[in-house]
Amino acid sequence: FSKKRIESVEVTKIHYDQIVKVKIQLAEEELELAGLIDSGNQLYDPLTKTPVMIMHVSSLEHCLPSWLTEQIYSKTEIPQIPENDSGWATKLRLIPFRAVGVESQFLWAIKPDSVQVDHEGSSIVVNKVLIGLNTQQLSTNGEYQCIVHPKMLISQKMVIA
């Protein structure tokens, strides 16, 4: 068995369309959100192969500098990072993506300080993940605030709760 084949077997064990608790730490702020495990989320950073979870930008707005949220809402594709705030340069990525009925475009993504997913009685610390910042609401009824990439639940460090 190759590692890729074993991971594909593990993916089939995950219950999709399940709501999980997601804890995110970013810029000395901690958020706790409901996340939907979505098999349709196959978004990766093409350079690092890091999985990308999706979140509405308003959920993180209080953690982000105003210049960044303005650029995300205006769909700026070339980041303009102020010199006095250059620490954000190492946390930002632009991820190419396609959605149904939409031409190819870019999604702003940010590298969080830490992410933890509570799934089936275990806490999973996800070290390799990006948060894609979407400008469209994800859930019409507010049931979840982020879309969890299934790869976040595989090959990660499990912490017994």
Curated annotation (Swiss-Prot):
UniProt GO BP: asexual sporulation; proteolysis; sporulation resulting in formation of a cellular spore
Signal sequence segment: none
Domain of life: Bacteria
Assigned EC number: 3.4.23.-
Record-level Gene Ontology MF annotations: aspartic-type endopeptidase activity
Active-site residues from the entry: D38
Keyword Thylakoid among UniProt keywords: no
Classification via InterPro entries: SpoIIGA
Keyword Protease in annotation: yes
Keyword set, alphabetical order: Aspartyl protease, Hydrolase, Protease, Sporulation
Enzyme class (EC, first level): hydrolase
Functional note: Probably activates the RNA polymerase sigma-35 factor at the stage II of sporulation.
Protein family according to the UniProt entry: Belongs to the peptidase U4 family.
Record-given protein name: Putative sporulation sigma factor-processing peptidase
Organism whose genome encodes this protein: Bacillus thuringiensis subsp. kurstaki
